[in-house]
């Protein structure tokens, strides 16, 4: 563990993610999106692309992000 933990998300939160490396570049900004059918994901503010497949709950989304942190894919994450 690197001391970084996925935050508890709310729909409409803006999220800054700093990646260790890869196709996403050094850092990207996202917004937590969802609808009445509970399809939650992080939406890239620059491209509009979904970071994850739609999830049933915000807890499921948090778990996916935490797995990326634990696996060293995400270096830093912050809600702003």
Regions found by a protein language model. Give the residues of each.
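Mixed-charge, Lys/Arg-rich low-complexity intrinsically disordered regions
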Residues: 1-11
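Intrinsically disordered, low-complexity, charged/polar segments
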Residues: 45-80
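Short beta-strand or tight-loop elements
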Residues: 11-13, 28
């Amino acid at each position: 563990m690197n001391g970084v933990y996925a935050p508890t998300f709310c729909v409409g939160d803006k999220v800054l993610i700093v990646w260790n490396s890869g196709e996403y570049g050094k850092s990207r900004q996202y917004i937590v999106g969802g609808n009445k059918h509970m399809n939650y994901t992080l939406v890239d503010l620059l491209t509009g692309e979904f970071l994850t497949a739609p999830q049933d709950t915000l807890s499921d989304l948090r778990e996916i992000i935490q797995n990326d942190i634990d696996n060293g894919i995400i270096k830093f994450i912050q809600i702003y």
